[in-house]
């Protein structure tokens, strides 16, 4: 692994099975204590110290969990690999059946795995008096509603 040596395991706290699968994965991969950390996507914003030293984040859930994770991890430039456990999984790279056979390639930087950098958009809503009311980052698209 690179100078960043920690692996983050992120789950959706609304679905306890995602945390169970994250913990099971840590055990099955035989990761040493101190080389990994676990967080829900909902509390990930409290993990800035851990994210500074993270080489990869493994996200258990659907596209919503992945998008919540990206909002926090993007400023740390942490690559993600998604494990599909939600209803929608277009953004997830792996299924739960592929964890043991393929996830080590991502974690231990197999040369066949390439990181795809994605552009993000930032939208800011400014009121008529030029005050910024809201700012949001987006990976996929922006939508205006009246």
Where is each model-derived feature located?
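Short, acidic/turn-prone active-site loops that include or flank metal/cofactor-
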Residues: 85-88
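Catalytic core of DAGKc-family lipid kinases
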Residues: 90-146
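Proline-centered loop/turn at the N-terminus of a beta-strand
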Residues: 77-79
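Generic beta-sheet signal
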Residues: 81-83
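N-terminal glycine-/serine-/threonine-rich phosphate-binding loop
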Residues: 1-61, 65-75
